[in-house]
UniProtKB/Swiss-Prot annotation:
The keyword Phosphoprotein applies. Pfam families: HSP70. The keyword Transport does not apply. This is Chaperone protein DnaK. Residues 615-632 have a biased composition (Basic and acidic residues). The gene is dnaK.
Amino acid sequence: MAEKKEKIIGIDLGTTNSVVSVMMGDEAVVIQNQEGSRLTPSVVSWTKEKEILVGEPAKRRAILDPENTVYESKRFIGRKFEEVKEEAKRVSYKVVPDEKGDAAFDIPNAGKLVRPEEVGAHVLRKLKEAAEAFLGEPVKKAVITVPAYFNERQRQATKDAGKIAGLEVVRILNEPTAAAMAYGLHKKDNVRILVYDFGGGTFDVSILEGGEGVIEVKVTAGDTHLGGANIDERIMDWLIEEFKKETGIDLRKDRTALQRLKEASEQAKKELSFKMETEINLPFITIDPNTNQPLHLQKKLTRARLEEMIKDIVDRTIDIVKQALEDAKLKPSDIDEVVLVGGSTRIPLVQQRIKEFFGKEPHKGLNPDEVVAMGAAIQAGVLAGEVKEIVLVDVTPLSLGVETYGGVMTVLIPRNTPIPVRKCEIFTTAHDYQTEVEIHVLQGERPLAKDNKSLAKFYLTGIPPAPRGVPKIEVCFDIDADGILHVTAKDLGTGKEQSVRVEISSGLTPEEIERIIKEAEEHAEEDRKKKELIEAKNQLDHLVYQLEKALKEAGDKVPADVKSEAEKVIEEAKKTIETATEIEQVKQVTEKVLQVSSKMGTTLYGEAGKQAGGGEKKDEGGEGEVEAKPVD
């Protein structure tokens, strides 16, 4: 009998929402989460009780408890605090530098600094658990997608998040590449496809070529601050301004109102994708401070009005499409197929502009929210040996190089080079008798080193003293299939070499990862115990309610000694529900309540029998008997 293959799941860890998928036979199946939804909001919230909420329950707290609810953490993963100062102003929680200068979150209810990797891990763990429930077996490996523009630090940080969640990330995959796989591009001959990915928080365009089992990403472009959230904000701002004109009240100062407005704006946007107008109705949105009377918000929003509001946003996406085509030296007519990815592509104006620009209908065969996760599942299937005949070629989105004499960036790997790739160049010393050289690794498109992103610095020492230009230093850049960069510098005269994995400069150390994993495991055990205690208290509370109800309805039919015993145990149970910290305490009192309930049920049953035999009122006794039965 053939050994069962270990399942590898595919995960789209999105800025706004995340999705998990797995190959079942020849099909990528999207898995529902614990709430029964295929979309899981990428939101984590910490309560005062130290409970950690993930997904939809956390999203509902985003405005009610903004300091303790982290959303769009993907914007900060693998980045230095200095790089994200502007980003930090856009969120309601506090972004601070950690001891290494990396971006972290100061969450009061967490009682510590929380790193973006930890937030990502909470979301990934929820998706992992959903997959395990669906498959009925443990899941240990995953393919996780990232935006095409993610640099090496961000990719490594995403892998760290997976490790914290208990997942071995066997491949990091560019989101547009995943979409191409989901659409079966590899099955077509000589096809050019443009992936237009308009998600909740980011916008990406990729141009790919495929045929004969090969997928190659040629060009990527994008804007990390363009997404469906911008459209929601436009609707929300309009509602706030309209309400202010009518009442003089600014709803921005009311957190509860803002949460409701945010949800209503998102819902209105979705409805206007298939309706010409929608009514936004928010009763009791606030209180009039002058009359102390409740105020209601009721507005009609038409599709035409929405399109006016968001025209510039859609225009910006088309500008980025033009930039990608220019980079690829292509015209719109050179594109064979346009693929729409991301929930925002459901908006009719988006589809209309794409159709006008390319002169053809965009391809909409798959759910745009799920297509990336499905592609990740297909790649996972390839790695697990379940799917054959796909060769995947990703590209590096930005040029990579080193700083050379005079502060110039010398490029080793140009932008849009297919990966995996290895490139080497020979350099020499800039000064006489130089015994060491600094290797400064850079990423970007600017000619001067200072204008590009610094990825890492390391030193090659022990070079024999010689006149400048004599030593030969070979520098090799090696990008693996996950887009992680390895840099090696070797003195060809002595054979001495030094190397660096670029992500280490900003990622978590192995010790930190282990600590976070340990913390997460300890927290999971606490969560399980907490959940069991709450469930036990709920059961006890239900039994107490039934017993009180039976006592009240039976009235004087309950003997005094039984009634006294029941009242005592009810009092004890209520105190236990309020104060118990151990499940055993609750179980002991639950047993007492069940015993008293049983005794009372037996007594009432006997009394009812006597009444029936004596020709007394049967109806009243019957009701007491029926109500008493569930207590047994």
